[in-house]
């Protein structure tokens, strides 16, 4: 299981918010880690229905699975990576963000794990904004986001191709295998443009208010 981490290393409570790649190829050690060490109870899959169906998560006993697509197939295929990131926080995504934060508010059983395909882009956006809501320092948020570059290894055959690739091909390669600070910058910039501030985003697009944000902090942050 690649790109896995428990966000407790950021001053969140242990076994509450996890992130990883898709859970299609879990070995026995992965299963034990999720169920017994981290008390996994809910998986939120951010992939499109197509991705959800073609590479299905391994079903673990006692775990609930919810598919909440952050982006559509058309958005992923047609938009540049920065535009795709920005699109994730547009006003037409209100239902998506409201569902995500309602599940966080309602959670009382154990850990919630967020993932997409590689656990770097869609998962990176969602985790970054959850951490923002919890009041985590922006520098720390970016550090966690960029940590995916260390967690995901590029297959050697692709490294060889990169030596002879065009500039455009190299840019596409980097976008596919790595995250960049500029991508996440696009999210926060679009939030400022559309909602005036990060708090405006939480109120207008996520269905949150001061009381709900306080409850989230009490539920997920260390005392």
Question: Can you say where each PLM-predicted feature lies in the sequence?
Answer:
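Cys-dependent protein tyrosine phosphatase-like superfamily
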Residues: 1-113, 126-223
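Ser/Thr-glycine-rich phosphate-binding loops at phosphate-binding pockets of nucleotides
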Residues: 118, 122-123
């Amino acid at each position: 299981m690649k790109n896995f981490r428990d966000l407790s290393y950021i001053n969140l409570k242990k076994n509450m918010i996890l992130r990883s790649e898709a859970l299609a190829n879990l070995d026995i050690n992965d299963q034990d880690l999720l169920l017994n060490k981290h008390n996994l109870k809910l998986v939120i899959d951010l992939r499109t229905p197509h991705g959800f169906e073609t590479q299905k998560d391994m079903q673990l006993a006692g775990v609930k699975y919810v598919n909440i697509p952050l982006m559509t197939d058309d958005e992923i295929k047609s938009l540049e990576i920065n535009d795709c990131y920005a699109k994730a926080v547009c006003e037409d995504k209100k239902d998506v963000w409201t569902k995500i934060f309602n599940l966080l508010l309602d959670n009382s059983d154990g850990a919630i794990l967020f993932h997409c395909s590689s656990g770097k882009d869609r998962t990176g956006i969602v985790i970054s904004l959850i951490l923002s809501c919890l009041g985590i320092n922006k520098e720390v948020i970016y550090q966690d986001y960029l940590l995916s570059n260390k967690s995901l290894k590029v297959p050697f055959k692709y490294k060889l191709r990169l030596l002879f690739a065009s500039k455009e091909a190299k840019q596409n390669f980097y976008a596919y295998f790595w995250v960049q600070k500029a991508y996440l910058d696009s999210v926060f910039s679009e939030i400022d443009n559309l909602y005036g501030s990060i708090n405006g985003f939480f109120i207008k697009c996520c269905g949150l208010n001061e009381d709900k944000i306080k409850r989230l902090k009490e539920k997920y942050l260390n005392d």
